[in-house]
Amino acid sequence: MKINILLSVLLGVVSHVMAVSLTSSSVHVSTSTRISTVSTSSKVSSTSLKASSTSVISATSTASTTPYWLETIKHQGISAFNQNSSYQVFRNVKDFGAKGDGVTDDTAAIQNAMSAGGRCAPGTCAGSTTTPAIVYFPAGTYLISTAIINYYYTQIIGDPNNLPVLKPTQNFAGFGLIDGDQYGGNGLKFAATNVFYRQIRNLIFDLTGIPPSNGLTALHWPTAQATSLQNCVFKMNDSPGTQQQGIFIEDGSGGFMSDLVFYGGKNGVVFGNQQFTVRNLTFYNAVTAIDHIWDWSWTYQGLSVNNCSVGIDMSAGGTTGQSTGSVTVIDSTFTNTGIAILTAHNSTSQPPTGGSLILEKVSLVNTPIAVQGPTGKVLGGGTTTIGGWGQGHEYTPSGPVNFEKAFTPFSRPSSLTVSSKYYTRSKPQYQSLPLSSFISVRSAGAKGDGVTDDTAALNAVLNSAAGKSVVFFDAGTYKVTSTLLIPVGSKIVGESYSVIMGSGTFFSNINSPQPVVSVGTTGQSGIVEWSDMIVSTQGPTAGAILIQWNLVSPASTPSGMWDVHTRIGGFAGSNLQLAQCPTTPSSSTVNTNCIAAFMSMYIVPSASGLYLENVWLWTADHDIDDPNNTQVTIYTGRGLYCASTKGTIWMVGTAVEHHDLYQYQFANTKEVFAGLIQTETAYWQPNPKAGVVTPVVAGWNDPDFSTSCHGVNGTFAACAMGWGMRVVGSEDILIYGAGLYSFFNNYNVSCSNPVTPPGGNGAACQTRIFSIEGTTSKNINMYDLNTIGSISMITRDGNSLALYLDNVNAYQDTIALFKSG
């Protein structure tokens, strides 16, 4: 269970009052303290660049007559552990009566497609893995009169070849055309920090038929990990006085979004969430493109802001209570925009590191002010490129130094860039391929029922399809009792997060770890594409490496993994739920039946050329299928271990949580781009201490807490807790935003209470959280490091370089710029 910091509590910590008033048609956010912005009329005039909301359909698709394979493929997916054997996973809204003709009110039909089959509804269910669904929209215009209420574990997918349109009626009532977390009498009905496993992609949200004074929201999206928005268009009225907004997020622990286009509106987006990775968002003609109401850390990559008054407004709370913790903006452009960044930060603002900001490779075109502070212009603009500029605290490597100036940006290895920008690639949807290019694993003999051993059937279909067909994993849970080998040339896509589940004695020997899924064989060259799936284990599998990546892929066309996650325990069928693995804070006895994995993901020394996007490696801290999301104790030895000697690795929007020895470990590797990364220390630590469940194994570069923790701060137990990030003998590890969190000490949350209000304990959950080791480690550089619950923020060869008390933010502690040297 994520720390569910209620928004009112968090903003109380930073003395920022935010009123959220719900009406039948809108949510209006007002802040008691906000730096004055320019008016709508102060947009930089440029009729040549002002884009019409009808001139562009999508950032990544164009109209086509090609049938989308997902619409026409035989749908035989199942929910393996749903007691209703006829439960329907794929739902075409037209099969439920929607017309999509732009005239008929399709609200009831769409909501029925969402809810049919006893699914997990907000307010009546905290979470469920047994009621997954794809709600599919064929091409058309769907008129709705009330909000579509989103259910847990839902993928809302439109036809990418002909984006379907959602439009409100004139009397529309609700918070968002799609409401991702409905409000009730006690606030959000889902705990926003626990809303996992959902997507929205390939839709147009069109508000332009509604008067601009009607402050409708297109999408309400409080959300957590393993969620994504992709390839959507938001059309809003851009007339003077418009009150419309595209996306509203006020809570959660995200998250990823990419390839979104916004036209008009008072706010393109309003963002408030612990952390997020945002890539390739484009804004036209908004008053404010991005309005930050709060965060801990956000990373923006590839923004394009055009003809707006303000690009990013991160001034909420004013100088006495900044509620935006930190923002990193890279490879982005602001064109014909009055102010690119509006901030409340200065040398005396509070909290001291609130409003930390990093700009790297940011281009301005006819944008007069790059950064405006509380009393005026801080950084001028015009038409220029900002190589590196920031504000906050820096350690280079010593500190803290409070800075607000230009700096030398990180040196980017050429292997990671294209035309000097970092390489990116969106999740493939294969929309141009005919249905004949796909092969279903269930049609090929696999069952996916969570009981049958599907190892042989899956290996057979993968081998036969490699380099020829896209392998479609119909929804289901595919039990394997030995390693599943993904061959070179494979393209694999899941349905509603199809699960591969390792089970049995083959994976049970902690002294002889075996991969559940092996991508290629050691030293093999080639490319694999893999998306929309989960890898898990069942029962005690102490020797399981869930994903082992072996492939050598070229930097120019790397292999990719998109929306592929590991989930260890905490779900129906795992035999690692509340009944088997309850918390034991009063006992030091380890339940060996709950030692569930050796490692989540291993990138082997010979591997290279791997692009990860929106990947969450999670050992469950709670039982998703329990009515109360009750906490559990499950043990996994290691998180993500990158040992690639050649490197050329991209980690875009990744998170690793609740492993014993470490979450991220980079050892003897190089040339890694990572941003944003997020971790959580296992809640059960230090009972037992790190390394008790997971003995140190020669050859794995494991940290040895039994020696490294003696004498550290005089508190052995608090030291012997898993590293959030550990770097050993590596170079050019470039981190663009990080949230390394330690919320608990043996399930006691008071250790992470903030310094303020009075009575808070500060960061007292563990002693250290980020370690750099070895004389050969160099250019370990990081923007916007945010930690929670750790006394030391950065440790170099056992010595602390930065303490949290020197870098206090609202709830977290922040260092804007760190260079190891």
Can you name each region flagged by the protein language model?
Residues G729, Y736-G739, S752-N753, P757-N761, ...:
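Long, ordered, helix-rich scaffold segments
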Residues F137-T141, Y153, N161, A475-G476, ...:
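Tight coil/turn sites that cap or link beta-strands
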Residues K2-I134, A147, Y152, D159-I210, ...:
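Extracellular "leader-to-stem" segments immediately downstream of a signal peptide or signal-anchor
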Residues A460, S464-A465, V470-K479, T483, ...:
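C-terminal, well-structured subdomains that either form a transmembrane helix-short loop-helix hairpin
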Residues T146, Y153-T154, G264-N267, Q274-I290, ...:
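Internal alpha-helical scaffold/solenoid segments in large eukaryotic proteins
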Residues D449-S464, T477-P487, K491-E495:
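Glycine-rich phosphate/ribose-binding loops and adjacent secondary-structure elements
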Residues L143-S145, Y478-S482, P487, F673, ...:
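Flexible loop/turn segments at secondary-structure boundaries
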Residues T242-Q243, D626-P627, Q631-Y641, M651:
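Active-site-adjacent structural elements in folded domains
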